[in-house]
């Protein structure tokens, strides 16, 4: 549970535009009445050192829908031939999985 509390503290610091340091993380957790080991604060501070937490989170939000929408619009623009080629590629990929011998229920 300590890691969750430290994560939320890091989000609070990032939102406030403050530097994510071990001391700042511990200050927020103590103000919230949570007892957190110093180790967790040190680990998170070192992991997030020099990184923009807001940029990391916005990158996850933007990456998913853009990739899916681009592939869907490309297939629609190319017409039925692209869809048929995609199906052939998927079938080939499924067949190659069978050849590996890793089937659990074969």
Swiss-Prot record:
Taxonomy of the source species: Eukaryota, Fungi, Dikarya, Ascomycota, Saccharomycotina
Subunit composition and interactions: Component of the large ribosomal subunit (LSU). Mature yeast ribosomes consist of a small (40S) and a large (60S) subunit. The 40S small subunit contains 1 molecule of ribosomal RNA (18S rRNA) and 33 different proteins (encoded by 57 genes). The large 60S subunit contains 3 rRNA molecules (25S, 5.8S and 5S rRNA) and 46 different proteins (encoded by 81 genes). The 5 acidic ribosomal P-proteins form the stalk structure of the 60S subunit. They are organized as a pentameric complex in which uL10/P0 interacts with 2 heterodimers, P1A-P2B and P1B-P2A.
Modification type N-acetylserine: residues: 2
Role, per record: Component of the ribosome, a large ribonucleoprotein complex responsible for the synthesis of proteins in the cell. The small ribosomal subunit (SSU) binds messenger RNAs (mRNAs) and translates the encoded message by selecting cognate aminoacyl-transfer RNA (tRNA) molecules. The large subunit (LSU) contains the ribosomal catalytic site termed the peptidyl transferase center (PTC), which catalyzes the formation of peptide bonds, thereby polymerizing the amino acids delivered by tRNAs into a polypeptide chain.
UniProt keywords, alphabetically: Acetylation, Cytoplasm, Phosphoprotein, Ribonucleoprotein, Ribosomal protein
Organism of this sequence: Saccharomyces cerevisiae (strain ATCC 204508 / S288c)
HAMAP family, A to Z: Ribosomal_L12_arch (MF_01478)
Gene3D superfamilies assigned to the protein according to its UniProt record, in alphabetical order: 1.10.10.1410
Modified residues (Phosphoserine): 96
Single Gene Ontology MF annotation: ribonucleoprotein complex binding
Protein name: Large ribosomal subunit protein P1B
Gene Ontology BP terms: cytoplasmic translation; translational elongation
Compositional bias (Low complexity): 69-82
């Amino acid at each position: 549970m300590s890691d969750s509390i430290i994560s939320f503290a890091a989000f609070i610091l990032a939102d406030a535009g403050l530097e994510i340091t071990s001391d700042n993380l511990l200050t927020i957790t103590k103000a919230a009445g949570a007892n957190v080991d110093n180790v967790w604060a040190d680990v998170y501070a070192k992991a997030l050192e020099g990184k923009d937490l807001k940029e990391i989170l916005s990158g996850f939000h933007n990456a998913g829908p853009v990739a899916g929408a681009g592939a869907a619009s490309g297939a629609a623009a190319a017409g039925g031939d692209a869809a048929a080629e995609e199906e052939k590629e998927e079938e080939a990929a499924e067949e190659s999985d069978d050849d590996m011998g890793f089937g659990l229920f074969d």
